[in-house]
C-alpha cells in the first residue's frame, strides 16, 4: 500500500516525454499508469515529442529488442504495418490539445491511441481514424488539431519546452520519465521496470521520501 501524498508532496510532477507511435513509449506508458494510480496527486505532463514525421519506419530489430526487454509481444495487426512510414503528427496535435485543455483525459487518451496503433494496427493519419477514440472519451477537439500536414501551434510550442528539458537532462532519447519535486529533477530509468511495472511505485516513493523530508 502506497502512503498518500501530503499537501507538500502534491507539488510533485511527472513528465513523460514520448511519441505515441514509438514502441518503447508504448511499453513505458504502463509505468505512467502505475504511477498515476498510486499517486493521483502527482501532476502529469504528457509531452508528445512528435518524433515520427512520416519519413521513417520502425525496424523489426527494434521491435524484437522491445519485446525482449519488456517480455511482451506486438500484435500481428501492428507488425504488418511496420514497413510503412510512421507519422504521429495528428496524435501529437491531439495529445497536446488534451494536455492543455482536458488534462484529466490526457492519460486515457494516450492509452486509447496506443491501443489503436499497437494492438489494432491503425496508422492514425486521418481524422476519421480517431473517431471511435474521440467518441468513447466524449472529447470535442477543434478542427485545427486534425491538419495532417503540420504540427499545431500548441504542439510546436510544446516541442520547444521538450527541447529545453532535454538540454537539462542531457539526452534527447525518448521515452523519458522525469519526476520533479520542488527544485529537484529525477530521471527515472524506465528500462528497470518494464517487466514489473508496479516496482516503479517503490522507486517513486523513495524519491518522495528523500526530497520531501
Predicted regions and their residues:
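C-terminal cap of thioredoxin/glutaredoxin-like
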Residues: 18-21, 28-36, 115-213
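Generic signal for short, ordered secondary-structure residues
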Residues: 11-14, 77, 92, 145
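Structural alpha/beta surface segment adjacent to cysteine/selenocysteine redox centers
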Residues: 26-121
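A short beta-strand-turn-helix
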Residues: 1-12, 159
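A broad, low-specificity signal for short, low-complexity segments enriched in glycine/proline
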Residues: 5-9, 55-58, 134-141
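Short active-site neighborhood of thiol/selenol oxidoreductases, capturing the structured segment around
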Residues: 8-23, 28-32, 44-45
Amino acid at each position: 500500500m502506497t502512503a498518500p501524498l501530503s499537501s507538500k508532496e502534491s507539488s510533485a510532477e511527472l513528465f513523460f516525454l514520448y511519441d505515441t507511435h514509438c514502441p518503447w513509449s508504448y511499453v513505458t506508458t504502463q509505468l505512467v499508469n502505475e504511477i498515476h494510480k498510486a499517486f493521483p496527486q502527482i501532476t502529469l505532463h504528457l509531452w508528445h515529442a512528435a518524433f515520427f514525421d512520416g519519413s521513417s519506419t520502425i525496424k523489426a530489430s527494434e521491435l524484437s529488442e522491445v519485446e525482449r526487454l519488456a517480455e511482451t509481444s506486438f500484435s500481428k495487426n501492428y507488425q504488418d504495418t511496420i514497413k510503412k512510414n510512421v507519422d504521429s503528427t495528428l496524435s501529437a496535435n491531439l495529445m497536446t490539445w488534451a494536455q492543455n485543455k482536458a488534462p484529466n483525459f490526457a492519460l486515457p487518451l494516450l492509452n486509447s491511441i496506443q491501443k489503436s496503433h499497437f494492438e489494432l494496427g491503425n496508422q492514425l493519419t486521418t481524422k476519421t481514424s480517431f473517431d471511435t477514440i474521440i467518441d468513447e472519451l466524449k472529447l470535442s477537439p477543434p478542427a485545427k488539431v486534425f491538419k495532417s500536414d503540420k504540427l499545431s501551434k500548441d504542439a510546436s510550442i510544446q516541442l520547444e519546452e521538450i527541447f529545453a528539458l532535454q538540454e537539462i537532462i542531457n539526452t534527447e532519447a525518448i521515452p523519458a520519465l522525469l519526476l520533479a519535486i520542488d527544485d529537484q529533477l529525477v530521471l527515472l530509468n524506465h528500462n528497470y521496470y518494464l517487466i514489473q511495472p508496479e516496482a516503479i511505485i517503490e522507486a517513486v516513493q523513495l524519491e518522495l521520501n528523500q526530497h520531501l523530508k
